[in-house]
Each structure stands twice: as structure tokens, then as C-alpha cells.
Amino acid sequence: MALTLEELVKRFGGEIAGDAQCKVSGLAPLDQAGPQQLAFLANPKYLSQVETTRAGAVLIAPKDLEKLRAATGGQAAGPLNFIVTPNPYAYFARVAQMFIDLATPPRAPGVHPSATIDPAAQVAASAVIGPHVTVEAGAVIEDGVQLDANVFIGRGTTIGAGSHLYPNASVYHGCKIGPRAIIHAGAVIGSDGFGFAPDFVGDGDARTGSWVKIPQVGGVTIGPDVEIGANTTIDRGAMADTVIDECVKIDNQVQIGHNCRIGAYTVIAGSAGIAGSTTIGRHCMIGGAAGIAGHVTLGDYVIITAKSGVSKSLPKAGIYTSAFPAVDHGEWNRSAALVRNLDKLRERIKALETALAAQGGTDA
């Protein structure tokens, strides 16, 4: 389906520079777009691609359009048509979602014959329940929810209106999923937190006893507009709920321990691990494979770079890193050798300082 720039601006805002009746039917990168496609410029370093793109129109920020016109002496360069908007990247995302929605026929509401719905569950008439879905007693499936094949919803759990759970996602008992959640395939919400009390006597080979499992009687509460990636796991609380606030975005294969609280608009990249009872503030960014210890607090607007380890609270906004970036193998070996010998070097320096002080060559 093709839409004019005028139709896009009526829906999403912005200003048109060029032909308002120019039609686009999809999106593509600047260097690959054709005359029927809309491209976008989010990074000024690619401004030169705007001059050569074949796109029918380009989403561009006002300052970048001014730079383009200055570079071409005010002459037309590249496409004649632009939608001028302060945030071309976000505009692109909204238009892309619209095209996907237009191209995806809505699924008819109803319950697949192979699904198992407990008589004590409440399922809205507008919900779409796919093959082999299980919904236990007391669960509430609100309006417009879509549960794909093999989804499991535990007893007493609520799935908020407009949410979409992809195949094989599981939400254990007693959890609350807010409206418009997106939970991708294989994610597990509400499994037991990692809680065990040591009950051992003696030392060494004479040690006896075992670990005593601590029942995890809390749940998981997830706010509106949260997205959870494939195979991510969010543990239920030991006593109170684990809480994921509104508009949090979590990537694939992330582990969030029991009793954590993740503040609104925070994003967490793939393979990050967050130990139990940790609080992360609003608008934080956690890089891929970062590890955060338990019982620490991160303030609002904290950024943790990829593969960093956080062992203490970071209340102040800022960028924090402890990762060792990749370097040439030989350079890494030399650096490692220096680290191994730091203690010896320290002792040699202390000895030199002592000798110099004894000779009066420097202050002690």
C-alpha cells in the first residue's frame, strides 16, 4: 500500500519540503532505497548519501537539511522531497510499524480447539488463543491479547489488554503483565528466584547438611508497554514482587533475579545478568553481557557499558565501564605480564625511593 507524504505528515507530524503527493510504499536505507521508498538520515556523517540516494523521499532533521542545502549551494541534491522532523529515527520507527500493521492481516479472535482453558479462567472474547496454549484457573486474559502456540499462563495471572506473547513463552502463577506487553518466544516470567538457605555442620570432608530451598512466594509485576526478548528470564520475588516498570525494553537472554526493580524507560541489552534485590533507576542503559551484583542500586540515567561488572551502588548519573576492550593478542600478553609483575615493580620502586632518601636525593 502506497501513502503520500501528505498522508504521513497528517498521521505523524513533520513538515514537507517538496512534493506532498509523492507516494512511498516502504522504507529502505539511503544507499539502497528506490523511488517508491522512504529513507531516513539519523547520523549526519551519512549526509553525502542523501545527495546520491534514489529514494523518493527522505526523513531529515532541520539542521541536516540546512547543511545539505549549504553544501549544494541551495540547489536540489538527491531526492527533491523531504519530511523534516526533529527525530528522523523515531519517525522512521513509527512509519515502519504502520507499514507492518497495514501488511499484516489481523487474526480472528477465538480459541484454537487444541488450547486448554480452565473453566475458572477469564478470556476476553476479542483475545486470540493459539494452538496448544494453556491458561490455568483464575487467570485473566484481557481484550485483544494474542497468545501464540504453546504459551503457558499460570493460575491467577493477568495478561493486560493488547499484549502479544510469542510461541512457547511462559508466565507462571500470580504474575501481572501490563497492557501492550510484547513477550518473545521462550521467555519465562515468574520462575523461582535463586534462594537457598545453607544448613551445614562441620568442615572439610566432615561437613554434613544441605541447602534448604526458600519458597518464592512473591510474583512479577510488569508495567505497560514493556518488551521482553526471546529466552529472557525474570524471577518471581521471594516475598514481594519483582517489578518491571513501564516502557522497559529487555533484549534476548537476559537474567533478572528475584526482587529486582527496573525503572521506567530503562533498556537492557542481550545476555546481561542482574542479581537479586537490585534496583535500577529510570532511563538507564545496561550494555550487553554486563553483570550487576545483588542488593545494589543504580540511580536514574546510569549507563553501564557492555561486559562491565557492577559490584557496588552507583547513585550518580553517568557512564560506567570496567570491560577490557579487545587488543592485539601480543599486546594483551605483554599487558598481562606487566600486571602479574606489578607487585615486584612496586617493591623495586619502594627500594629505590628508600635508597634515594638515604642519599638525600629526594624527600622521604
Swiss-Prot record:
E.C. no: 2.3.1.191
Gene Ontology MF annotations: N-acyltransferase activity
Pfam families: Hexapep, Hexapep_2, LpxD
InterPro entries xref list: Hexapep (IPR001451), Hexapep_transf_CS (IPR018357), LpxD (IPR007691), Trimer_LpxA-like_sf (IPR011004), UDP_GlcNAc_AcTrfase_non-rep (IPR020573)
Key words, A-Z: Acyltransferase, Lipid A biosynthesis, Lipid biosynthesis, Lipid metabolism, Repeat, Transferase
BP GO terms, sorted: lipid A biosynthetic process
Top-level enzyme category: transferase
Catalytic activities: a UDP-3-O-[(3R)-3-hydroxyacyl]-alpha-D-glucosamine + a (3R)-hydroxyacyl-[ACP] = a UDP-2-N,3-O-bis[(3R)-3-hydroxyacyl]-alpha-D-glucosamine + holo-[ACP] + H(+)
Enzyme active site: 258
Subunit structure: Homotrimer.
Family designation: Belongs to the transferase hexapeptide repeat family. LpxD subfamily.
Name of the protein: UDP-3-O-acylglucosamine N-acyltransferase
Gene name in the database record: lpxD
